[in-house]
């Protein structure tokens, strides 16, 4: 079967999960850019060894007019069918296109690499610019693992991370197979919903995830993973407390698997967040309040997001009787 993906990179990793279980394999995976995502063809060389090393892959190619049996990237144009995860969003679309009755959940490891022993004992940290959670206790994580932590990601991510949470060295890799091998060889992966996190999930490696309140769609019920959305975390030396005095006010519906909503400002996650912030129950700065209330649908805080989303969120909060205590919305636009 010929399957295309236009990315992002994390999408490709979860498509691999589906191909690892899909009948009538091995399959051909084809990259093509479609203008809706960040462009994935440029990563072909970096992905090649990782993808072709998987036993369920027959061939890995760039698009050049080949027959396409399933354009997996088209999941973005369809309504999500109550997914538990990003993988479920892909497969809900794939089942319809392929007229398949298979139940694919990504419960087992689907990435197979040789662990890099050079990273034995290491803790790998990653934090991309999207899908963040300001309740995640990064400062405490860095303190806990500083002597053996390394950061993976682009230069801008590393610089920002060190400025915010303290210095940790950054490691670069010539291809994504080597990155996956480093994660597999490490003791633990800690990160947000990034490409590195997708690799870690494909390996089913020990992990702590910084869960996005806006798009919590990378949750998998396994015993060696922690999902932190309110500051609570189990570290080797101690347990960190919830940063919200009344956790019941954030209604995440975090029963695994399933139950998450994708309804923007009408979701219980947003309503609970408004209440917690307005009641001053959360130990956050004014800047963090702004970031939470002005995040765009993609989880990024940009000027255009403030212009569009902040006034709408404030209006929603006022209608709900919640005071966000932001004196002048125009000052942020």
What do the PLM-derived regions correspond to, one by one?
Residues 1-333:
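Catalytic machinery of carbohydrate-active enzymes
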